[in-house]
Amino acid sequence: MAEKVAVIVGPTAVGKTKLGIALAKKLGGEVISGDSMQIYKGMDIGTAKVKPDEMEGIPHHLLDIKEPCEPFSVVEFQRLCRALITEISARGRLPIIVGGTGLYIQAALYDYQFSAAPSDEAYRRALKQLAAEQGAEALHRRLEAVDPISAARIHPHNIRRVIRALEVYHCTGKPFSEWQQGQSKRLLYEAAIVGLTAEREALYRRINERVDEMIAAGLIEEARALYDRGLRDCQAVQAIGYKELYDYFDGRVSLDEAIEQLKQNSRRYAKRQLTWFRNQMPVKWFDMTDAGQFAAKVEEISRYVAGKLQLEANI
């Protein structure tokens, strides 16, 4: 019998973390982070990582497991997440994956075989050199020209994934998005996939407010600590919230410009996340626009998940 898994996805700042904790309390669950940046130590504020005193006693997994310059891939996430699903289920608890990194979550839930993808080391090195000389945006424009679907899914600053998509196109003549569609889409688990959304104006307002809160909480100092350690070429510091402040530390933009760029990049990322989840996974959507209705939404979503997975719930 397939193991049961609840999944909470959606754009940044929509309230996934808070709902994940509430759902875990209702359904006897443990949270697995489905965020590719929250795995890194020392990157707490910029990744909106849940604080220990906010967890309300709910175990959280796949947080703070890597140093910022340690490599981490979707393949490793797939392995770790699946192992955790088995461990949590064996304890009689419900695994609840919470996050916004769609490809990572999809890879864990579905029968994806990444080892089948072709590779060309020399071509990869050439693309890395191109990125170093012309910048991440130039590399992303190249991907847009041959595979606009993958370009929409992959952030321009995620150089490693942009290169991987270009590499697959180079080796196969097929866009990476088309190659992925040829992969098995068999769901390995009995899953209830919940998506959180909000009206655009409300979501963008929350994003802007959260950036201001991050700045007040010490994001500049957090990013500066990474900068002062000489961490410049790591995948981690290309994340939204750090790349923009690195430009400020380098003197290329003012602090106000960096903060405005951070807000804009976060809003664009939220839009890409929504598009991806709507097109790639069988999601049951819930509107979280009215923050005053959070408790009612917790009840509604708990009932949906409990019904879908045939669980006994504390409702």
From Swiss-Prot:
Spell out the InterPro entries in the cross-references.
Answer: Dimethylallyltransferase (IPR039657), IPT (IPR018022), P-loop_NTPase (IPR027417)
Q: Which SUPFAM superfamilies match?
A: P-loop containing nucleoside triphosphate hydrolases
Q: Which domain of life is it from?
A: Bacteria
UniProt entry tagged with the keyword Transferase = yes
Q: Where is this site: Interaction with substrate tRNA?
A: 101, 124
**Which chemical reaction does it catalyze?**
adenosine(37) in tRNA + dimethylallyl diphosphate = N(6)-dimethylallyladenosine(37) in tRNA + diphosphate
Family the UniProt entry places it in: Belongs to the IPP transferase family.
- From the Swiss-Prot or TrEMBL record, give the protein name: tRNA dimethylallyltransferase
GN (gene name): miaA
